Design a protein with these regions (language model features):
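Intrinsic disorder/low-complexity detector
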Residues: 30, 82, 104-107
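Short beta-strand edge/turn micro-motifs at domain boundaries
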Residues: 99-121
Length: 121
């Protein structure tokens, strides 16, 4: 079998999303960095204003404003895969006292799934 199956691709994406979840729960961006492409972006809305930009903004918040949250729980609600593109929704409770819904876009680059964008609520 030379081509990966859907289940293999799905599980590879779950592994990437798990790196993100672990970094958030442990308040350590070094644990989540491997999940993201170096050119990745993140965006959200604060009040009525668009906020975000380079993924470094996320790392800074994780390292400076979050605290380890062993009580954090995350659920991968959905993963859609088409060829080398995928999207995912992850709902997280109790990360530094917050509840998040994250939407990720991933691409398979050089045989590895990587997050290229994140939007959040």
């Amino acid at each position: 079998m030379s081509n990966p199956t859907y289940v293999q691709e799905y599980n590879a994406i779950v592994d990437v999303l798990s790196q993100y979840n672990e970094g958030g729960a442990k308040a350590d961006s070094t644990l989540m960095k491997p999940a993201f492409n170096e050119q990745a972006t993140l965006f959200g809305v604060d009040g009525d204003k668009l906020v975000g930009g380079a993924i470094q903004n996320l790392y800074d918040v994780i390292d400076n404003s979050f605290r380890p949250s062993p009580e954090a729980r995350a659920a991968i609600v959905r993963i859609d895969i088409v060829g080398t593109a995928a999207s995912a929704r992850v709902d997280t409770d109790n990360v530094s006292g917050f509840r998040f819904t994250d939407f990720f876009n991933l691409l398979k680059v050089d045989g590895q799934w990587t997050i290229v964008s994140k939007i959040y609520h």
